[in-house]
UniProtKB/Swiss-Prot annotation:
Cited Pfam families: ATP-synt_B
HAMAP family reported for this sequence: ATP_synth_b_bprime
GO CC entries: plasma membrane; proton-transporting ATP synthase complex
Gene3D superfamilies recorded: 6.10.250.1580
Quaternary structure and interacting proteins, as annotated: F-type ATPases have 2 components, F(1) - the catalytic core - and F(0) - the membrane proton channel. F(1) has five subunits: alpha(3), beta(3), gamma(1), delta(1), epsilon(1). F(0) has three main subunits: a(1), b(2) and c(10-14). The alpha and beta chains form an alternating ring which encloses part of the gamma chain. F(1) is attached to F(0) by a central stalk formed by the gamma and epsilon chains, while a peripheral stalk is formed by the delta and b chains.
Official protein name in the record: ATP synthase subunit b
Length: 156
């Protein structure tokens, strides 16, 4: 290989091509590559921000769900307590009403017992008067002996 003028001319042409490429071709390519890198970086940053926002939104949703569950459980517990209180109150009222009915029935039975005893006393007094009348074979005046008959009733 001999070095002659064509090699120098080719070197100069290559150098001019390199300078032309560096001056006119390379800057738009570099600019396009930089813009592309910037877009990719912006896209990655937006994706990271969206991922962070999504995680924050999921966390807020979980917190709100937990709060809602707690409120629901609290409301259910309150409703159960109220229902239990209403049931207990109804039981107490029913028991009280039952006790009143039993007391009234007892009082009525006691009154009927007293009335029956009074009726029996009067019948016994009348029988005693008739028996005494038959024994004595004379008539006993109930109006005259009312005090005696009343004492006889109380003793019976």
């Amino acid at each position: 290989m001999s070095i002659n003028a064509t090699l120098f001319v080719q070197a100069i042409v290559f150098l001019i091509l390199v300078l032309f490429t560096m001056k006119f071709v390379w800057p738009p390519i570099a600019k396009a590559l930089d813009e592309r890198a910037l877009k990719i970086a912006d896209g990655l940053a937006a994706a990271d921000k969206a991922k962070t926002d999504l995680a924050a939104a999921n966390k807020r949703v979980e917190q709100e769900l937990a709060q809602t569950r707690n409120e629901t459980a609290s409301r259910l517990a309150d409703a159960e307590r109220r229902a239990q209180a209403i049931i207990e109150e109804a039981k107490a009222r029913a028991s009280e009403e039952g006790n009143k009915i039993v007391a009234a029935a007892r009082a009525e039975a006691e009154q009927q017992t007293v009335q029956a005893r009074e009726a029996l006393r009067e019948q016994v007094a009348a029988l005693a008067v008739k028996g005494a009348e038959q024994i004595l074979r004379k008539e006993v005046d109930a109006g005259v002996h009312a005090d005696l008959l009343n004492r006889l009733k109380t003793e019976l």
